[in-house]
Amino acid sequence: MSGMVRGIRGATYIEKNEADCIIRETKLLLLEIVEKNQIKAEDICSILFTSTSGLNASFPAMAARELGWKYVPMLCSVEIDVPDSLQNCVRVLMHVNTFLKQDQIKHVYLKEAKKLRDDL
């Protein structure tokens, strides 16, 4: 596929700092992003993950690896600890090759993370 490289944002809330919770919720987020935007793994250029400082039981990128996305470059980082911001949150920036226009991209915010972008 060619087209353009576009960024797709997403975030979800993780109830407990446990590896299975982080991986399960991140996997659900990734699956919803690819479904809503009709993306195949080979269309994904890269994924950046951030998590708030209280989530360190697993790398969120493990969720993508469990989905079989072994050729997608990924990076995990800690989100800036802004006072009064949403905690226990994994954020995603997925770069994809797509023919969708910017206003056709469907960003995905789940659970308590919906309040991060209530304009969408």
Regions found by a protein language model. Name each.
Residues M1-L120:
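Terminal domain-initiation and capping elements
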